[in-house]
């Protein structure tokens, strides 16, 4: 939770800065350089958007699965269901968090 709550606002700010850079590229740079900045900026914006969506979706699904697991009484059944139901969302969530950290250059 902590990583998500810290990372998403940073992603939003970074995405806004990229949008500003892309919008200003053609007024500041030569056409060829502006196009390159525009293309790189748009790709980064799309990548950020995809990873933020992946984080939100998988965090929600993981919470839902975790609620179902916590209702079980039997510890073995809990462990099996956690492994089968919660962990896959956790792994995908970790992937999106790591990718977003890489894009944002955040440790």
Task: Please report, for each region that a protein language model flagged, where it lies by residue.
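C-terminal amphipathic alpha-helical interaction region
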Residues: 1-107
């Amino acid at each position: 939770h902590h990583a998500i709550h810290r990372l998403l606002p940073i992603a939003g700010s970074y995405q806004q800065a990229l949008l500003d850079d892309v919008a200003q590229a053609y007024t500041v740079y030569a056409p060829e350089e502006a196009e390159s900045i525009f293309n790189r900026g748009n790709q980064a914006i799309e990548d950020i958007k995809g990873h933020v969506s992946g984080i939100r979706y998988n965090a929600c699904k993981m919470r839902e699965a975790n609620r179902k697991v916590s209702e079980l009484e039997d510890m073995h059944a809990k462990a099996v269901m956690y492994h089968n139901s919660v962990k896959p969302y956790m792994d995908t969530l970790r992937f999106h968090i790591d990718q977003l950290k890489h894009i944002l250059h955040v440790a």
